[in-house]
Amino acid sequence: DLTCGFGIDAYFLSQNFEEITLIEQNTELLDIVKHNWEVLGRKANFINQKLEDFLKNNKEHFDLIYLDPARRDNHNRKVFLLEDLSPNIIEIQEQLSDISTEILIKLSPLIDIQHLVSSLQNIYKIWIIAVKNEVKEVLVYLKKTENQPEIFCINLQSSEPEFHFNLDDEKHCKSEFSIPKKYIYIPNNSVLKSGAFNLVSEKFGLRKLHQNTHIYTSEEKIEHFPGRIFETEEINSKAIKKGEQFNIITKNFPLKPEEIKKKYKIKDGGNQYLIAVKSLSGNHFLVGKLLD
């Protein structure tokens, strides 16, 4: 682990390896990690050194290199571009490849997947990890391969299936479009983060509402979808009654949920959903329920 910190990631990684080496430049922090690992009965090689110095002087070869780059700059501002992280992954990627054939990097959920793919060499796999539909981490696994990177979209603490694909899959797909039908599908945020908008349409046989509305529809219910499924019907906005309760969702729509709530004098909550969306034919209000 080249970015030890408090050693939490390294502790769990170490359960899968016979030996682990931790690099940390902060002496006091490394002393804390040493103490914690002794208490937990876990052994490691502790090296109090700057990452750059370690890479320059190291003669060993490792089965796996792990990094979790710092996501704040010298002014404590959040950063997420690869070139702004510390260490700068783009600058050191060749040095990393010299000491291991497999490299695992944990990155911010804000990282742009296309930027990632265009900036790093030898991307083997990417995991986009969400917890309860909030993207928490992006993991990138570097290993020399002739294949296109595989992308895995995972929504933990949900019953939704994993969705995975390679980049060529998305490039060769096209979406077909439709007005809203009986069932509405909203992919979870790990899938949306991946950018596989056309592949979702083609793989599940769904129609998209609009190029910029990443919501899908079908007349028959499709099972095992990586996201939420709603059974809906379209209503005229004049049919929305004052004081009714809705969970409001807007996608590519002129009004935000708070503006809809204020305009139509409706309340949050209840079991019903009001979905305000834009299709190629115009704006729609859909009322329905979330299916299990």
Language-model regions: role of each:
Residues 1-292:
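SAM-dependent transferase fold signal centered on methyltransferase-like domains
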